[in-house]
């Protein structure tokens, strides 16, 4: 991200208010329309989804949380984890 002048990468763990088929489908539909979210995974554990977000700076990310993710009715809570350094990044599976 730094090389592309994109600031930094954030992994945002999202917990929905309630989880059922309709709410999950609506959430994923909304997320697919948000360009700042470059990856989205349905996960197990304390949270329901893991989002990968690119942000140019902290103020931008704060506004994104308040004005974009914060407007999603089904969103219950979130936790942001900021990437300090990318240690390894590969595509594909080596057999």
Feature locations, PLM:
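A compositional/biophysical signature of low hydrophobicity enriched in polar/charged and small residues
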Residues: 1-95
């Amino acid at each position: 991200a730094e090389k592309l002048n994109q600031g930094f990468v954030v992994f945002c763990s999202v917990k929905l208010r309630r989880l059922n088929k309709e709410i999950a489908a609506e959430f994923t539909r909304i997320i697919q329309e948000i360009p700042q979210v470059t990856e989205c995974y349905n996960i197990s554990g304390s949270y329901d989804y893991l989002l990968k977000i690119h942000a140019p700076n902290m103020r931008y990310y704060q506004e994104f949380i308040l004005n974009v993710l914060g407007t999603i009715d089904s969103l219950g809570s979130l936790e942001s984890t900021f990437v300090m350094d990318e240690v390894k990044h590969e595509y594909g599976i080596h057999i």
